[in-house]
Every structure is written in C-alpha cells, then in structure tokens.
Amino acid sequence: MANVQYYDVILKPVVTEKSMNAMAEKKYTFLVHPDANKTMIKEAVERMFEGTKVAKVNTMNCEGKNKRRGMVTGKTAKTKKAIVQLTADSKDIEIFAGL
C-alpha cells in the first residue's frame, strides 16, 4: 500500500445491531481498506479520534456474494472489517454518540 494516508484506511463505520451492542464493551466496527493491516488501523483510529487509545484490533476479510441479474451472474466487491477495542481509560468515539 504505497502512499495511503490514515483517513484512507478507515472507510466508514458499520452500523448494525450487533456492532451497536458491542459498543457497551468499547468495541467499534469499521469498514477498512482491503490492504490495511492492524497497525495501520490502530494508528488511523488514534489519529482520527482524539483521546482514544486502542487496546486491540481484530480484522476479517469478507468475500463478495454471488449475485444474478437475469442471465448475467457477477460478484459483489470483497470487503474488510475491523473491530477496534479501546482501553478502559480511553474516550468514546463521537460518531457513534447519537446512534
């Protein structure tokens, strides 16, 4: 990954019921760049959100699903998700505050 900035690593937050329940344990779920590694994700979260300290990062690669439109078959894009756990003394992430 040449020349990728920290704001290119985190694409968007994942807003599902499961990810909202995990926020009680200070675990936040993000869609990340497919080439990003755990150290890049940790650095990006700590830079983007002031006062946060990352305890650990879990990542998962999600394969694209097979889709069909008429006779034509294709695949949706592959994605990568990261579950970021913050330390106990860390501030909460503000983008999830109103949800």
Swiss-Prot record:
Part of the 50S ribosomal subunit. Contacts protein L29, and trigger factor when it is bound to the ribosome. GO terms for molecular function: rRNA binding; structural constituent of ribosome. One of its GO terms (biological process) is translation. SUPFAM superfamilies: Ribosomal proteins S24e, L23 and L15e (SSF54189). This is Large ribosomal subunit protein uL23. One of the early assembly proteins it binds 23S rRNA. One of the proteins that surrounds the polypeptide exit tunnel on the outside of the ribosome. Forms the main docking site for trigger factor binding to the ribosome. Keywords: Ribonucleoprotein, Ribosomal protein, RNA-binding, rRNA-binding. The keyword ATP-binding does not apply. The keyword Ribonucleoprotein applies. InterPro entries: Nucleotide-bd_a/b_plait_sf (IPR012677), Ribosomal_uL23-like (IPR013025), Ribosomal_uL23/eL15/eS24_sf (IPR012678). Pfam families: Ribosomal_L23 (PF00276). NCBIfam families: PRK05738.2-4. Belongs to the universal ribosomal protein uL23 family. The gene is rplW. One of its GO terms (cellular component) is ribosome.
